Amino acid sequence: NLLQFEKMIKKMTGKEPVVSYAFYGCYCGSGGQGKPKDATDRCCFVHDCCYGKVTGCDPKMDVYSFSEENGDIVCGGDDPCKKEICECDRAAAICFRDNLNTYNDKKYWAFGAKNCPQEESEAC
C-alpha cells in the first residue's frame, strides 16, 4: 500500500516521500498526463503503468509483505497479486535512488497539470 511504498522510498533515497515525490513532475503523485519531464518523473510514469497492469487487488490499499536485506528490498508473501504490487513499488523506489543525481525539485516540484499537455501523453 502507499504507506509501505513511502517506507521503501525513504529507505532507498533518504528523502521524505510525500514532500519530495507526491507533487513532482507530470506523473509523481495522483494521476498523470503529458510527457515525463525527467528521469524521476519517468520512474513515476513506469510505476503508474505497473499499477495499471495489476488485477485482482488494490495497489494503493492492499498490504503486502517485504523486508530489507543488505540494503535491498525483498518482496515476499504468498499472494501473487500483492507481490506484484510490492515489485512495482520496489522498482520505483530503486529508480528514484538511481536518479537522485538529476532530481530537480526547484524545477519540477508542484509542476501542475497545465505544464503536462494531455496530447503529449505516452502509452504504457
From Swiss-Prot:
<keyword id="KW-0964">Secreted</keyword>
<feature type="active site">
    <location>
        <position position="47"/>
    </location>
</feature>
<feature type="disulfide bond">
    <location>
        <begin position="75"/>
        <end position="86"/>
    </location>
</feature>
<dbReference type="InterPro" id="IPR036444">
    <property type="entry name" value="PLipase_A2_dom_sf"/>
</dbReference>
<feature type="disulfide bond">
    <location>
        <begin position="57"/>
        <end position="81"/>
    </location>
</feature>
<keyword id="KW-0479">Metal-binding</keyword>
<feature type="disulfide bond">
    <location>
        <begin position="43"/>
        <end position="95"/>
    </location>
</feature>
<keyword id="KW-1015">Disulfide bond</keyword>
<dbReference type="InterPro" id="IPR016090">
    <property type="entry name" value="PLipase_A2_dom"/>
</dbReference>
<comment type="function">
    <text>PLA2 catalyzes the calcium-dependent hydrolysis of the 2-acyl groups in 3-sn-phosphoglycerides.</text>
</comment>
<feature type="disulfide bond">
    <location>
        <begin position="28"/>
        <end position="44"/>
    </location>
</feature>
<dbReference type="GO" id="GO:0005576">
    <property type="term" value="C:extracellular region"/>
</dbReference>
<dbReference type="GO" id="GO:0005543">
    <property type="term" value="F:phospholipid binding"/>
</dbReference>
<dbReference type="InterPro" id="IPR033113">
    <property type="entry name" value="PLipase_A2_His_AS"/>
</dbReference>
<dbReference type="Pfam" id="PF00068">
    <property type="entry name" value="Phospholip_A2_1"/>
</dbReference>
<feature type="binding site">
    <location>
        <position position="31"/>
    </location>
    <ligand>
        <name>Ca(2+)</name>
    </ligand>
</feature>
<dbReference type="GO" id="GO:0047498">
    <property type="term" value="F:calcium-dependent phospholipase A2 activity"/>
</dbReference>
<dbReference type="GO" id="GO:0005509">
    <property type="term" value="F:calcium ion binding"/>
</dbReference>
<feature type="binding site">
    <location>
        <position position="29"/>
    </location>
    <ligand>
        <name>Ca(2+)</name>
    </ligand>
</feature>
<keyword id="KW-0442">Lipid degradation</keyword>
<dbReference type="GO" id="GO:0006644">
    <property type="term" value="P:phospholipid metabolic process"/>
</dbReference>
<feature type="binding site">
    <location>
        <position position="48"/>
    </location>
    <ligand>
        <name>Ca(2+)</name>
    </ligand>
</feature>
<dbReference type="GO" id="GO:0042130">
    <property type="term" value="P:negative regulation of T cell proliferation"/>
</dbReference>
<feature type="disulfide bond">
    <location>
        <begin position="49"/>
        <end position="124"/>
    </location>
</feature>
<comment type="similarity">
    <text>Belongs to the phospholipase A2 family. Group II subfamily. D49 sub-subfamily.</text>
</comment>
<keyword id="KW-0106">Calcium</keyword>
<dbReference type="InterPro" id="IPR001211">
    <property type="entry name" value="PLipase_A2"/>
</dbReference>
<feature type="disulfide bond">
    <location>
        <begin position="26"/>
        <end position="116"/>
    </location>
</feature>
<keyword id="KW-0443">Lipid metabolism</keyword>
<dbReference type="GO" id="GO:0016042">
    <property type="term" value="P:lipid catabolic process"/>
</dbReference>
<dbReference type="InterPro" id="IPR033112">
    <property type="entry name" value="PLipase_A2_Asp_AS"/>
</dbReference>
<feature type="active site">
    <location>
        <position position="89"/>
    </location>
</feature>
<feature type="disulfide bond">
    <location>
        <begin position="50"/>
        <end position="88"/>
    </location>
</feature>
<keyword id="KW-0378">Hydrolase</keyword>
<feature type="binding site">
    <location>
        <position position="27"/>
    </location>
    <ligand>
        <name>Ca(2+)</name>
    </ligand>
</feature>
<protein>
    <recommendedName>
        <fullName>Acidic phospholipase A2 BA2</fullName>
        <ecNumber>3.1.1.4</ecNumber>
    </recommendedName>
</protein>
<dbReference type="GO" id="GO:0050482">
    <property type="term" value="P:arachidonate secretion"/>
</dbReference>
